[in-house]
From Swiss-Prot:
One of its GO terms (biological process) is protein folding. This is Protein GrpE. GO terms for molecular function: adenyl-nucleotide exchange factor activity; protein homodimerization activity; protein-folding chaperone binding; unfolded protein binding. Participates actively in the response to hyperosmotic and heat shock by preventing the aggregation of stress-denatured proteins, in association with DnaK and GrpE. It is the nucleotide exchange factor for DnaK and may function as a thermosensor. Unfolded proteins bind initially to DnaJ; upon interaction with the DnaJ-bound protein, DnaK hydrolyzes its bound ATP, resulting in the formation of a stable complex. GrpE releases ADP from DnaK; ATP binding to DnaK triggers the release of the substrate protein, thus completing the reaction cycle. Disulfide bonds: none annotated. SUPFAM superfamilies: Coiled-coil domain of nucleotide exchange factor GrpE, Head domain of nucleotide exchange factor GrpE. One of its GO terms (cellular component) is cytoplasm.
Length: 208
C-alpha cells in the first residue's frame, strides 16, 4: 500500500470517528432535553397540586371556624337553658310560698269563726228544734274542717303530748298524777298548723 492510500484510509477512519462522536453528543443532548422536559412536567404537576391545596385550605379553615362557632353557640345555649330552668324553679318556689302566705292569712281570719262554731256545739238542749239546728251546725263544721284539712290545715295535738314551746302555749300549770311532768293535761284552745307553719299555737295546761 502506498503512502497515499494510507493517508486516505486514515482520513476515512477519522471521519467515521468524528461522526460517531457527533452522534453521541447529539444523543446526549436529546436525552438531556427529554430529562429537562420531564422535570418541567413534574414541576408543573407539583405546582398544580400546590394550587389545589391552596384552594382546599380556605374551605377547611372555614369549616373549622363554623365548627368553633357552633360549639360556642351550643355552650351559650346550654348555659342559658340552665339559667332558665333555675329561674323557673325559683319562680315556682316563690309562687308556692306566696300561695301559702295567702292561705295563711285567710285561714287565720277563719279560725275565730271556727272557735265560735265549736263553742255553739258545746251548748246542750233538749228541744227538738235546738237539736235539729245543732245537728245542722255540726254538719257545716265538719264540712268546713275537712275542706281546710284538704288545703293543708292541721290541728295541733295536745292532751297527753309532751309540751313543745314551738307549737304550744302554756297558760296554766297542773299537778295531775295521771300525767308525767311536762305533759299536757288539758287543751284550753285549739291550735292549728298550715303545712309546716304554725297559724296559732295551742293554749294548754301543763303538768308540773
Amino acid at each position: 500500500m502506498t503512502n497515499k492510500d494510507e493517508s486516505v484510509e486514515k482520513n476515512t477512519e477519522s471521519t467515521v470517528e468524528e461522526t460517531n462522536v457527533k452522534q453521541n453528543i447529539d444523543d446526549s443532548v436529546e436525552q438531556a432535553e427529554e430529562s429537562k422536559g420531564h422535570l418541567q412536567d413534574e414541576a408543573i404537576e407539583e405546582t398544580s397540586d400546590e394550587n389545589v391545596i391552596e384552594e382546599i385550605d380556605p374551605k377547611d379553615q372555614k369549616i373549622n371556624e363554623l365548627q368553633q362557632l357552633a360549639d360556642e353557640n351550643e355552650e351559650k345555649y346550654l348555659r342559658l337553658y340552665a339559667e332558665f330552668e333555675n329561674y323557673k324553679r325559683r319562680i315556682q318556689k316563690e309562687n308556692e310560698i306566696n300561695k301559702t302566705y295567702q292561705a295563711q292569712r285567710v285561714l287565720t281570719d277563719i279560725l275565730p269563726a271556727i272557735d265560735n262554731i265549736e263553742r255553739a256545739l258545746q251548748i246542750e238542749g233538749d228541744d227538738e228544734t235546738f237539736k235539729s239546728l245543732q245537728k245542722g251546725v255540726q254538719m257545716v263544721h265538719e264540712s268546713l274542717i275537712n275542706a281546710l284539712k284538704d288545703n293543708g290545715l292541721e290541728v295541733i295535738k295536745t292532751e297527753g303530748e309532751a309540751f313543745d314551746p314551738n307549737i304550744h302555749q302554756a297558760v296554766v300549770q297542773d299537778d295531775n298524777p295521771d300525767f308525767e311532768s311536762g305533759e299536757i293535761t288539758q287543751e284550753l284552745q285549739k291550735g292549728y298548723k298550715l303545712k309546716d307553719r304554725v297559724l296559732r299555737p295551742s293554749m294548754v295546761k301543763v303538768n308540773q
